[in-house]
Amino acid sequence: MLFRGGEEGQIRKNLIENRHIQAIIGLPANIFFGTGIPTIVMVLRKKRDDDKVLIVDASKHFIKDGKNNKLQASDIKRIVDVVSNNRTVPKFSRLVSIDEIRANDYNLNIPRYVDSSEDAETWDVYASMFGGVPKSEVEQLEEYWNAWPSLKAELFRDNGVCYACDHDDIATVVRNNADVQAFIASYGQAISGLPVDLRSRLVEHPEQVDALGQETAIGKELDAMIAGTPLVDPYDAYQKLDDAWGGISIDLEVLGSEGFDAVRAVDPNMVVKKKGGKDVEVQDGWIGRVLPFDLVQRELLHDDLTAIEADDRRVQEIDSEIETILEGFDEDDKQNSDAINQDGDAFVAAELKKAVKAIGKNPASDFERGLVQAQKLFDETKKLKSGIKTKRNALEEKTRDTIKALSDDEARRLLEAKWITPLQKQLEELPNAVIDELIGKVNALKNKYATTYADVCGQIDEAEKELAGMLGDLTGNARDLAGLEELKALLGGE
């Protein structure tokens, strides 16, 4: 379609010469079920005065979703933004003149106009021989040095021809840099007003919110907030918003259709279980229609939840203590005791109880004392698990009653904890992703030239000498020994 001749070529020529093609968008391969071929979107206009065509290569922007590739919301927004603004973006889009297309005989194959491939890795000959980090490769990280002017000098020492990096812990140097810390603080300040704005937009009257319109409006506001922050990709921020919006929009739909009181609704948790060989739907506890039980427990019933978690931790500790007891036993004792399985890695509950009963109150050896202690721990676990089950059931009932009795202010606070707090935390992590990316690149540069060609040759020479020495210990017939002597000579052995 984009480059074949014949009638297809004539169609392309007519569309180009009549200014009907506004944009050609190349999409990733394998995004449609059942076909792995790359696809394109051609944006056509009946009347255009522009003599340029926007060509977009979005083939690298996707995530894996099982066997298929999937466009994320941020990928779609990236495409929409460049097409709406008719904008050239390096390695993504380019405005191509009709004259250039004519010169290419109306061939519209996207790689002819937009090169989205990764730059090939290069190796500096001087640094490969003498070590150090080439200045040209350090300067490729210019966007970071522009954002954090003092960092390059802290990381690299100029030795004239190359840079030297003397730091073992690159991450600490980067994170402690004053400009980097100022960057984190500045970004945090830029988005600090978002929770207040989201409370006003979403939480005050959630039953009246236009979900689709608000996502668009919030996206624009978020974009404006971080517009002055270097390095942070606004499309990454938008993706965080869209990821959160999936759950938020479902809640807004429920509240919009049922009213604010739906926030206090609790429904039977229906699950499918096998009964008499058939799938039967039965109730398994309760779930909040809008507010998850675990959220309510964490925010309003913290003491009850903490008590259960403490018991859970104790059960795990007991498991470790029992394992330690087993590991401390002599192998002969393990093999001669019915209280321990044949593999020696677990107790046999019934036999352990019999053995402890037979031991009585006065164990005569370390092994018997270990068995008694293990039984005590098993008894404690049984009691704890029974108590945990009782506490969980009581907490579930208490959570159900708490949700039903929520005041409007409590309900709004919980909506904020569900919708806004996690999103804000996700957004606050974006600078750390940028910093981690630079740390990875600097470490890669340092390691790339850490071993010089002379070092490699020396290692090879040492390995050859070691191998030649080992060959001298081999024996065989005269024919084999002659071959080994020749190999030793090739390796430089005597």
List each model region and its residues.
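Extended alpha-helical interaction scaffolds
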Residues: 288-289, 295-296
